C-alpha cells in the first residue's frame, strides 16, 4: 500500500436538493450489487495476468501521464490527447475501481465522463492523468449525484478532511487522503490541473 497522498475533493454546482428525499431503495440496491459483481470480475481477471502483463499496462499508463505534461491545456483541448481509450482498458473500458470506506462506497471506474460511464459507475475525465498515481499527476473522477436508482456520488458531501479513499488499478492500490473540499463552477479548470511533484485525485460531482 502506498503512503497517503494529498487529494482534492470537489463538489460541483450540481443541485443536491434531491439528497434529502427518499430514493427507490430497491433499484439502488440492485445497481450497487451489480457494481460489486463487476468489480469482482475485474479483480478476478486482473489476478489472472502475469506480472509482466501488469507491468506493461502500468508502464503504458505512466507513459500516457508523462505525455500529458507536454500538452498545453489538455482539459480544454482533449482531442489533442492520443491513445487514451486504449490505455488501461482492462475490461470493457473499466480501468479500476474506487473505494471510499467512510461512506461505504465501491464503484468501477471507466474511461470518459460520458453519460454511459456515469450510469455504470465512475467516469474518468479525459485530459486528466490516468488514476495510477505518480509524481505530477492529477486524475479527475466523476459520478452522478442524487440519482433515484443508483448511489453514485450522492453521499460525497459527507466526506470530511482527513477521510481516506483508495483506487485500485490491476494489482496496484493507491491510498489518498482528503485535504480540500470545494465548490467550483463547471468551466473552472484551475483546481483540476496538474501540480508539479504532487499526486492528486479530484472526485467531482
Located regions from the model:
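Solvent-exposed, non-transmembrane regions of membrane-associated and secreted proteins
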Residues: 4-7, 14-205
Amino acid at each position: 500500500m502506498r503512503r497517503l497522498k494529498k487529494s482534492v475533493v470537489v463538489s460541483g454546482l450540481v443541485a443536491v436538493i434531491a439528497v434529502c428525499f427518499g430514493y427507490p431503495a430497491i433499484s439502488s440496491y440492485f445497481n450497487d450489487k451489480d457494481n460489486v459483481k463487476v468489480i469482482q470480475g475485474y479483480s478476478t481477471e486482473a489476478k489472472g495476468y502475469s506480472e509482466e502483463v501488469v507491468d506493461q499496462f502500468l508502464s503504458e499508463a505512466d507513459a500516457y501521464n508523462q505525455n500529458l505534461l507536454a500538452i498545453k491545456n489538455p482539459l480544454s483541448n482533449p482531442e489533442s490527447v492520443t491513445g487514451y481509450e486504449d490505455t488501461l482498458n482492462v475490461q470493457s473500458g473499466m480501468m479500476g475501481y474506487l473505494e471510499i470506506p467512510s461512506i461505504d462506497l465501491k464503484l468501477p471506474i471507466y474511461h470518459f465522463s460520458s453519460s454511459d460511464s456515469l450510469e455504470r459507475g465512475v467516469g474518468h475525465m479525459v485530459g486528466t492523468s490516468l488514476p495510477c498515481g505518480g509524481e505530477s499527476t492529477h486524475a479527475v473522477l466523476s459520478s452522478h449525484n442524487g440519482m433515484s436508482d443508483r448511489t453514485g456520488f450522492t453521499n460525497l458531501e459527507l466526506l470530511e478532511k482527513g477521510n481516506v479513499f483508495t483506487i485500485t488499478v490491476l494489482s496496484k492500490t493507491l491510498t489518498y487522503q482528503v485535504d480540500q473540499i470545494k465548490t467550483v463552477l463547471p468551466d473552472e479548470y484551475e483546481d483540476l490541473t496538474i501540480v508539479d511533484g504532487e499526486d492528486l485525485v479530484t472526485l467531482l460531482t
